[in-house]
Amino acid sequence: MNVIDLFKKLLSFKSVTPDDDGGMEFIKEYLKGFEVIESEKEGVKNLFIYKKFGEGDHLCFGGHIDVVPPGEGWNTDPFTPTEKEGFIYARGAQDMKSGLAAFLWAMKNAKNFKGTLSALITSDEEGDAVWGTKYMLEILKDKNLIPDYAIVAEPTCEKVFGDAIKIGRRGSINGVLKKIGLQGHAAYPEKSINPIHKVAQVLHKIAGVDLDDGDEFFAPSKFVVTDIRAGMEVTNVTPGELKMMFNVRNNTHTDKEKIKNFIHEHFKDMNYTLELKQSAEPFVTNPDTKVVKALDRAIKNHTNITPQHSTAGGTSDARFFAKHGVKVVEFGVKNDTIHAPNERTTPEEVNKLADIFKEVIEEWN
C-alpha cells in the first residue's frame, strides 16, 4: 500500500470527533509488529504504537484521526475521497489525515533507526481535548515512555508546501469582566449607573492593545474583545450590569497575573468582577534542537525551501507534549482549506511529506 492509498483509506473513515469509526483498529493492523498501548474514556480512543530498535532517542509522531463535522456546501461526498483536477477532496484531507498517513507510512518503511520510534494518535483533538493526547501522555509518563522528541503532523504550511514549521504556539487566556451598575429609567440617567457608558470610556484604550513587545519567536500578546452584552433589548431602561468577554493569545511574556493587573489599571475606579481561565499554555522549542534541524534539512532536500520557524496560529496538541518536557515541533501540508467545505490537498504534498518524515527517521542517528 503506497502512501496515497493509505491516505484515501484513512479519509474514508467517518471519524467525526470523538468517533474513530474503526480507524484505530486499521492503524494497529497496518503497523502490525509494533507494541500497542490503548486507552478509551468518555468515548475517546487513544492509540500509542511503538517499537524499540536500539538504545537511542525516542522519537514520536503525534496526530489525530478525528475531524470536524463536514457541514454544508460540499461538491463531493466528504467521506468518499475524490481525486480531480490535481487535488484529493475529503474532510480531513489537510487536517490532518494527510499528516497521519505520511508518518504511518514513514514509520512502516523507514530503515536504520536506532532508538524508539512511536506514534500517539487520538480521536479527540477537534473536540474538548480532555481525554485525548493530554490524558494519554499521563499514562505514558507512568510507564516511563514519554518521548524525547515529537513531530506533530498538523498542517503548518501557508503559501507553498515546506514554507513553515511550528516551533511553538501561543497560549490562550479567556476572560469575562462584569461591570456592575445600577439599573434605572432612561429618562433619569442621573439616578442610575449605566455600565455601558462607564465601559465605553475605557474600551478604546484596551481593545486591540499589545500587552508586551513579543520577541524573536512570538508576536506581542494582544487584548481582543470578543463579546459585550448588556440591557434587556428595550429603549427605556438602562442596564444594571454589563458583561465583556475577551481573549488573549499570550506568549511567554504575558500571564494571567499580568492581564489581571492590566484590567485593574483601567477599571480600578469601577465596581467589577473578573474571571480568567488559561485554556492553553504557550511554549517554544529552540530552533537549534535536533528535531528542528532534522526537519529543516529534510524539507530543504525535498522542496528546496528553507522553512520559516513560526509560532503563529491557534493551539494544538503539541502543547501537551511540551508540558512533559518533550522537544516538539509541528509540520504538515498547507492549511488553506482546513475546516472548510471542499477541504483538499494534493497527492504531491502527501508524497513529499511522507518522504520528509522517512528521511528524518533514517537520518536521525
From Swiss-Prot:
Cofactor field: Zn(2+); Co(2+)
Enzyme Commission number(s) of this protein: 3.5.1.18
Enzymatic class: hydrolase
Binding site for Zn(2+) 2: D95, E126, H339
One MF term in the entry's GO annotations: metal ion binding
Catalysed reactions listed for this entry: N-succinyl-(2S,6S)-2,6-diaminopimelate + H2O = (2S,6S)-2,6-diaminopimelate + succinate
Residue sites binding Zn(2+) 1 per the record: H64, D95, E154
Function (record text): Catalyzes the hydrolysis of N-succinyl-L,L-diaminopimelic acid (SDAP), forming succinate and LL-2,6-diaminopimelate (DAP), an intermediate involved in the bacterial biosynthesis of lysine and meso-diaminopimelic acid, an essential component of bacterial cell walls.
Similarity annotation: Belongs to the peptidase M20A family. DapE subfamily.
Quaternary assembly: Homodimer.
The name this protein goes by in its record: Succinyl-diaminopimelate desuccinylase
Originating species: Nautilia profundicola (strain ATCC BAA-1463 / DSM 18972 / AmH)
Gene designation per UniProt: dapE
